[in-house]
């Protein structure tokens, strides 16, 4: 039976291609039917679409310059983040580069072509591995269906298409190992590791873990006599090839290493329990094995039910040969999935998520390839064992579904179909396999229907409309900036009215080629992340997703923001000193709106001078509001002798202090308790903060009458959110009745609760202006500990006001201080005039260089509103000058009296060293290849000589 189904490569390729086309049409055809693109999810517009457009333009320019003999690739871009190196967004995937260049004007089509072609290549890679390891061709064809069309791919990778490359690289990497060990051919292995070295570092780390495990398990299971010496001999060749590949990739790998270690990407502030998850996670794991639900964070499996039978078939078979390897891997992956330690280990303890479950998909697919032929030759006793374990699994699934209060997935019907096929058609094995292939295909269609169909899970609603997606990537609000006739270098900002739009318009600058004070990149510079947290910026999705600087007047001016766009119909926080200069009628998703363009009347260029400085140690003692005002008076430095020290002066006033705010909250809660006859309040004020027993609690703060004009802030210092569930607060929920019935009802409701990776949202509103801040909970994926939070309501005229605070998140909110601030703008104009007296003119950015001219009457500190980074080198009149970190995340250098030419040059840190290492390694590989060819040639000649002698 094994030999009868060993097909030629051509036949397998034709059958696979036909099958892929049919399944792709059935699964993704509904996107065309419903008018949806393949750009969707939380990061679809801001990262997937933005990356396609940016890389398309970048590589068009790069290859265009190359054709004209100009080799000076851009490695730094002011539009990337707040001004960062392009490695944050640059991709090295050849297919994505081609798609980007071909479809730069139609990113939606480019993403679709890239995604579907990547899936096709992933299937080819899987089949190549199966063929080399002598798997049954038909079983491989059945398994490849499950490898490509599963819950992980359909729920996650379609929206985050960069992760599809893992499905291509993993089988090729393991195929490379087999070729290296069996044939001493290292080409494929080196190519895979090289690509991982220039790609995402996290992918390299994860694949290295899998590779290490593969080599260890391979040696232990395939060698009867085991020893340390034998193991070292087994892995020496892969280790050398691995190092050669990393050395070859050093020109990109070393700069990426520097980028990662100097970034603000954070994991948990406090690592929680490493051994056990909450009950809800294990319930999700059981149902998510063949279902569509998420497991933990970004974790999906949704494998074919045929894999369930294959698992039970595996563990009822004798542990010999490949069966033994698969059993060991099953235990390893089970432990990874069952323990939080596995999640931390898969990310190098830099985060907490379950993306590593893609490895389980590969495992289950290989399991089907190996076990399907054996199932068709199984005896009665083994069938009974498999069916017994299957029955236990089904009972567990039913119990968990009842516990979760969810319906049992009708995907289980396919499990019975597979079992029936196995029982009835086993004697006609070839016919049985054809039926299994049809069932597997139908199962894929059902899975896709469950996930995407609007009447089911409706995940397709998360994807952008195909008619408007390209315009949405560019962002409608940016269109008015094209009318600006201004040759100077400046930044722009787009003001939106709610958190949803903030998230949709993340990476605003990068998507339009404009410079702005935002950025959504996994490896944002640590100085940027630390500064925005220190300043209490509330408009952040997570520590490295900065929407903007919250429309704060001083921060915009100090950052070189000159123009703003805003919809007239939206109620937004407007900074002080901006003048309306243009209006434009636009169509925003079917709604007629008026787009407005404002110009900052107090705009500073990217480079301006200070005559005084404030020591960083003094600056750190100030509250977020004072820090903003201090930077208008003196540049913040560690220390300097270039300019005198300045003691900042403040004119802000706290119109409500902590005691007043907490008193008002207590009165509201007492009134609510009296009205609802509650013994225990839904929200309690303690000495260290607030305990919120119910989510969605709305608090109202009455501000003093006859407010004077100024910028208004709500500031909360050292805020920390500790999530709690209903069981934690059962005393509150059972205060009216404590019957067994009430307790059971509470228990049922609490099953949907989880304290893992929880986040709260604090929404504030003043005079119709709403601001929402995301607050990640203790031990969550992006927990950074306590932080300052400042909500800016913009510049408001003298009016009465009532400030509302809505706490969306059950748990404890601890803080050291809370107050409402009025910041008058009386001194702002004077401070601006002082800063704008001596500025750098004729600023130009070209070929990784920033140049400009300045004339000063005395010694001053020149502040450069570009994020500080080691890659910059400064020259004043051609002489190298030391750059200092200023104002938390910007740069500064001293300038003497007189006229000066300023030049900043950017080089990727580690690029020169990496170039040398890559060059040396390339020569080593070439020399080794030449020697190998000569050796083979000599062996061939020797064999020919001996043959002639015998003749």
Where does each model-flagged region fall?
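Membrane-embedded helix bundles of polyisoprenyl
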Residues: 16, 20-22, 115-132, 137-222, ...
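Membrane-interface helix-loop junctions at the exits of transmembrane helices
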Residues: 25-33, 94-108, 138-160, 248-261, ...
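A cross-kingdom signal targeting lumenal/periplasmic-facing segments of multi-pass membrane
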Residues: 98-99, 514-616, 620-629, 633-674, ...
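Contiguous transmembrane helix-bundle modules in multi-pass membrane proteins
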Residues: 184, 324-341, 345-470, 764, ...
């Amino acid at each position: 039976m094994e030999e009868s189904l060993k097909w030629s490569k051509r036949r397998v390729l034709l059958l696979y291609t036909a099958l892929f086309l049919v399944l792709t049409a059935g699964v993704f055809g509904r996107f065309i039917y419903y008018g949806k693109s393949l750009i969707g999810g939380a990061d679809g517009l801001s990262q997937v679409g933005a990356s396609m457009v940016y890389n398309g333009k970048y590589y068009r320019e790069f290859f265009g310059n190359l054709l004209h003999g100009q080799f000076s690739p851009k490695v730094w871009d002011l539009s990337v983040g707040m001004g960062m190196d392009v490695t944050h967004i640059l991709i090295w995937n050849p297919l994505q580069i081609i798609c980007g260049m071909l479809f730069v004007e139609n990113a939606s089509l480019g993403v679709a072509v890239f995604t579907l072609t990547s899936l096709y290549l992933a299937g080819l890679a899987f089949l190549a591995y199966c063929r080399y390891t002598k798997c049954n061709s038909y079983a491989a064809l059945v398994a490849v269906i499950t490898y490509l069309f599963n819950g992980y791919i359909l729920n996650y990778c379609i929206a985050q298409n960069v992760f599809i490359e893992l499905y291509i690289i993993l089988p090729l990497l393991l195929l490379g190992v087999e070729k290296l060990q069996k044939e001493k051919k290292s080409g494929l292995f080196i190519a895979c590791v090289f690509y991982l070295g220039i790609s995402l570092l996290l992918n390299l780390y994860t694949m290295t873990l899998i590779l290490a495990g593969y080599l260890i398990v391979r040696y232990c299971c395939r060698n009867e006599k085991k020893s340390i010496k034998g193991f070292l001999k087994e892995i020496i060749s892969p280790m050398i090839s691995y190092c050669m590949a990393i050395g070859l990739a050093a020109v990109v790998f070393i700069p990426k290493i520097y980028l990662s270690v100097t970034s603000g990407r954070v994991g948990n502030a406090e690592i929680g329990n490493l051994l056990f998850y909450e009950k809800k996670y294990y319930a999700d794991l059981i149902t998510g094995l063949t279902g569509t639900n998420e497991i933990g964070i970004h974790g999906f499996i949704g494998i074919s039910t045929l894999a369930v039978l294959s698992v039970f078939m595996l563990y009822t078979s004798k542990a010999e040969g490949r069966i033994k390897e698969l059993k060991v891997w099953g235990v390893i992956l089970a432990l990874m999935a069952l323990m939080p330690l596995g999640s931390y280990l898969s990310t190098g303890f830099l985060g907490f998520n379950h993306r590593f479950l893609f490895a389980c998909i590969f495992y289950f697919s290989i399991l089907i390839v190996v076990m399907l032929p054996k199932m068709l030759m199984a005896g009665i006793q083994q069938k009974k064992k498999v069916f017994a374990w299957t029955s236990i699994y089904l009972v567990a699934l039913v119990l968990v579904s009842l516990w979760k209060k969810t319906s049992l997935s009708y995907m289980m019907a396919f499990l019975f179909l597979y079992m029936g096929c196995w029982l009835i058609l086993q004697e006609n094995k070839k016919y049985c396999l054809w039926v299994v292939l049809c069932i597997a295909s139908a199962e894929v269609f059902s899975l896709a229907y469950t996930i995407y169909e609007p009447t089911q899970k409706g995940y397709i609603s998360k994807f952008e409309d195909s008619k408007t997606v390209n315009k949405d990537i560019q962002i409608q609000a940016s269109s008015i900036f094209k009318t600006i006739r201004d040759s100077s270098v400046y930044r722009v900002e787009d003001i939106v009215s709610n958190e949803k739009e903030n998230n949709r318009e993340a990476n605003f600058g990068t998507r339009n080629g404009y410079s702005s004070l935002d950025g959504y990149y996994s490896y944002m510079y640590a100085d940027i992340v630390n500064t925005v947290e220190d300043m209490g910026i509330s408009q952040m999705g997570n520590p490295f997703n900065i929407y903007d600087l919250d429309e704060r007047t001083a921060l915009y001016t100090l950052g070189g923001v000159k123009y703003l766009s805003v919809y007239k119909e939206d109620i937004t926080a407007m900074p002080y000193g901006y003048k309306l200069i243009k209006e434009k009628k636009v169509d925003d998703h079917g709604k007629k709106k008026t787009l407005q363009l404002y110009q900052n009347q107090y705009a500073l260029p990217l480079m301006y001078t200070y005559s005084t400085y404030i020591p960083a140690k003094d600056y750190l003692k100030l509250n977020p509001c004072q820090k903003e005002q201090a930077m208008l008076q003196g540049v913040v430095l560690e220390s300097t002798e270039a300019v005198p020290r300045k003691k900042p002066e403040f004119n802000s006033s706290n119109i409500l202090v902590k005691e007043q705010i907490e008193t008002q909250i207590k009165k509201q809660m007492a009134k609510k308790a009296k009205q609802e006859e509650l013994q225990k309040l839904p929200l309690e004020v303690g000495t260290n903060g607030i305990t919120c027993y119910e989510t969605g609690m709305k608090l109202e703060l009455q501000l003093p009458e006859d407010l004077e004009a100024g910028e208004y802030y709500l500031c909360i210092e050292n805020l920390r959110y500790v999530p709690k569930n209903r069981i934690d607060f059962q005393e509150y929920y059972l205060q009216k009745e404590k019957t067994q019935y009430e307790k059971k009802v509470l228990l049922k409701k609490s099953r949907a609760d989880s304290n893992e990776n929880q986040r709260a949202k604090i929404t504030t509103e003043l005079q119709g202006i709403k601001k929402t801040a995301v607050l990640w909970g203790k031990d969550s994926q992006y927990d950074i500990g306590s932080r300052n939070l400042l909500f800016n309501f913009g510049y408001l005229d003298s009016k009465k006001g009532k400030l509302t605070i809505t706490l969306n998140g059950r748990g404890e909110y601890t803080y050291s201080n809370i107050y409402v601030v009025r910041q008058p703008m009386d001194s702002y104009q004077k401070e601006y005039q002082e800063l704008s007296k001596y500025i750098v003119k004729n600023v130009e950015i070209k070929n990784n260089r920033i140049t400009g001219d300045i004339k000063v009457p005395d010694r001053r500190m020149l502040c450069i509103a570009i994020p500080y980074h080691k890659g910059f080198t400064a020259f004043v009149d051609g002489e190298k000058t030391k750059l200092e970190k200023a104002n938390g995340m910007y740069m500064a250098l001293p300038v003497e009296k007189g006229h000066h030419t300023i030049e900043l040059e950017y080089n990727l840190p580690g690029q020169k060293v990496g170039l040398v290492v890559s060059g040396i390694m390339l020569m080593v590989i070439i020399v080794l290849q030449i020697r190998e060819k000569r050796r083979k040639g000599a062996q061939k000649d020797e064999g020919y000589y001996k043959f002639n002698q015998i003749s």
